[in-house]
Amino acid sequence: MSEQNELNTLKSRFRGYFPVVIDVETAGFNAKTDALLEICAVTLQMDEDGWLKPASTIHFHVAPFEGAVLHKEALEFNGIRDPFSPLRGAVSEETALKEIYKQIRKEQKTADCSRAIMVAHNANFDHSFVMEASERARLKRNPFHPFATFDTAALSGLAFGQTVLAKACKTAGIAFDNKEAHSALYDTERTAELFCEIVNKWKKLGGWPLFESQTEEIDKSQN
């Protein structure tokens, strides 16, 4: 692979990390006590010219774990009126995360990345729920970095002057339907588009690849 082509890889662009966009819908704000009700993951890929774009999508409705707290206001907000309805087709936290992690590890390996890193809007919230659900399910092979994330709320505030997902998308020229919002599937797909737009915009502005002199300085600091 040529030096230029090497720079146009996820591995080089994100220091060995494999970015995965996540969104969750929950029954509250406390990741330890409140139910995880829906989760979606969108993986990303980089084309041969170095442009970032969405790859695959995996989505699950999730059944509340035993003893989970369900806050009425949260359910009204996300529109999940009956978390126990069989019509939701919900699976356990363990099943959802195992399938998501399986897909992530497969694509991460193909991209030759060392670890997955979560991309999310207000990422601390989604990250905390995924980590707690992994602990409850006793999943030892969690592909995500334990604390590092890419937060599109912060990134879009820098790039577009907007931190609310809907407003950031509209400012970036990404269609956003407020009626579809607060579905993990819809929000994850829009967040993925937003993150790709930010990364690609930085490339268009000349921010990536780094100049050779910058790369040399980084290499020296690591030796």
UniProtKB/Swiss-Prot annotation:
Alphabetically ordered keywords of this record: Exonuclease, Hydrolase, Magnesium, Metal-binding, Nuclease, tRNA processing
Top EC class of this enzyme: hydrolase
Binding site for Mg(2+) 2: D23, E25, H182, D187
Described purpose of this protein according to its UniProt entry: Trims short 3' overhangs of a variety of RNA species, leaving a one or two nucleotide 3' overhang. Responsible for the end-turnover of tRNA: specifically removes the terminal AMP residue from uncharged tRNA (tRNA-C-C-A). Also appears to be involved in tRNA biosynthesis.
Biological process terms in GO annotation: DNA replication proofreading; tRNA processing
PANTHER family assigned to the protein according to its UniProt record, in alphabetical order: DNA POLYMERASE III SUBUNIT EPSILON (PTHR30231), RIBONUCLEASE T (PTHR30231:SF2)
GO CC term (a single one): cytosol
Domain of life the protein comes from: Bacteria
Molecular functions per Gene Ontology: 3'-5' exonuclease activity; magnesium ion binding; nucleic acid binding; RNA exonuclease activity, producing 5'-phosphomonoesters
Swiss-Prot/TrEMBL cofactor(s): Mg(2+)
Protein name as it appears in the record: Ribonuclease T
Site positions per UniProt: Important for substrate binding and specificity: F29, F77, F125, F147
Signal sequence annotation: none
Active-site feature positions: H182
EC numbers for this chain: 3.1.13.-
Database matches in SMART domains: EXOIII (SM00479)
Family classification: Belongs to the RNase T family.
Gene: rnt
Assembly information from the UniProt record: Homodimer.
Pfam families in UniProt: RNase_T
Sequence ranges assigned to domain Exonuclease in this UniProt record: 20-195
Binding site for Mg(2+) 1: D23
